[in-house]
From Swiss-Prot:
Protein name, UniProt field: Acetylornithine deacetylase
Cofactor field: Zn(2+); Co(2+); glutathione
Cellular component, GO, one term: cytoplasm
GO BP term, example: L-arginine biosynthetic process
Gene name, Swiss-Prot/TrEMBL: argE
InterPro entries reported for this sequence: AcOrn-deacetyl, ArgE/DapE_CS, Bact_exopeptidase_dim_dom, Peptidase_M20, Peptidase_M20_dimer, Peptidase_M20A
Signal peptide: none
Gene3D superfamilies assigned to the protein according to its UniProt record, in alphabetical order: 3.30.70.360, Zn peptidases (3.40.630.10)
Amino acid sequence: MKNKLPPFIEIYRALIATPSISATEEALDQSNADLITLLADWFKDLGFNVEVQPVPGTRNKFNMLASYGQGAGGLLLAGHTDTVPFDDGRWTRDPFTLTEHDGKLYGLGTADMKGFFAFILDALRDVDVTKLKKPLYILATADEETSMAGARYFAETTALRPDCAIIGEPTSLQPVRAHKGHISNAIRIQGQSGHSSDPARGINAIELMHDAIGHILQLRDNLKERYHYEAFTVPYPTLNLGHIHGGDASNRICACCELHMDIRPQPGMTLNELNGLLNDALAPVSERWPGRLTVDELHPPIPGYECPPNHQLVEVVEKLLGAKTEVVNYCTEAPFIQTLCPTLVLGPGSINQAHQPDEYLETRFIKPTRELIIQVIHHFCWH
């Protein structure tokens, strides 16, 4: 029953007070089970059918799908339940206590993005779900801030095919229809150590890596020349050499050298295509030094994403907001949800607040976000 729901600000407060940090470091990583239970209970109170899905390969993480109505199509509203870790020394407030000051709601996850679920629940007070002609789905995922394992697993296993989806990441209520992807790799070269007084008795991994870097930089130039997407501020795929380490002493031939790099592909480029381009670039080194060069993923890759600009979802949201869709450089779960249906990224709060100390969401977003959620539900589930 709707009258069982706490007030909007109390829902928000409870979400922020329930830690759900995602981290690759096990000591910092937390289960999102308590947060999922909170959400599940609230959506059940509204009459939704709720499924909780354990996410394999995680440390006790879960997805939640709340649904009302049956049949084909409908609308999916999605978001992630986890936050990044916080630096206690840089926060001036308790990250897990929602505080309001000077038109801002402070707390870890206020903008990115646990607060989005408070907006959905509050908006549903004014929606008569019994009159929906198409189903409404609410998806809460796990581990977006690390591996995106929740969205990946949901997209791989669900049979749902809504008409469209909106992911409520903080975009300042500016609709986003495309973003670049991200792949990160470790290039490792195994040489052969020896005393520097006799270089011929060893194989210097740093020298081999120098050769490999030359080929990687040529790939960077080729990506810039070959691929263009003018809507992006940087209208081509970028390649960055981010970290390198090799050797342990000035008088030893370096036995091992490792380079960490990333590529940010534009929409339309497949991960297989990128892996092929990287392997082709490094082929001369691999062929000259068989078995000494390896390429490994540092993190699960994220493809680029694009919603067709002429899709009904884009047209409807642009009309409702009076704003054109944008493209951005950061990554979201959209590439995985997009495999199910056309998807937009659109939510309250600023991306500039994501992962920042004293994270906040401006209260000016409360009314328009609530109204927007009601409008999109009416349009895609009542018509």
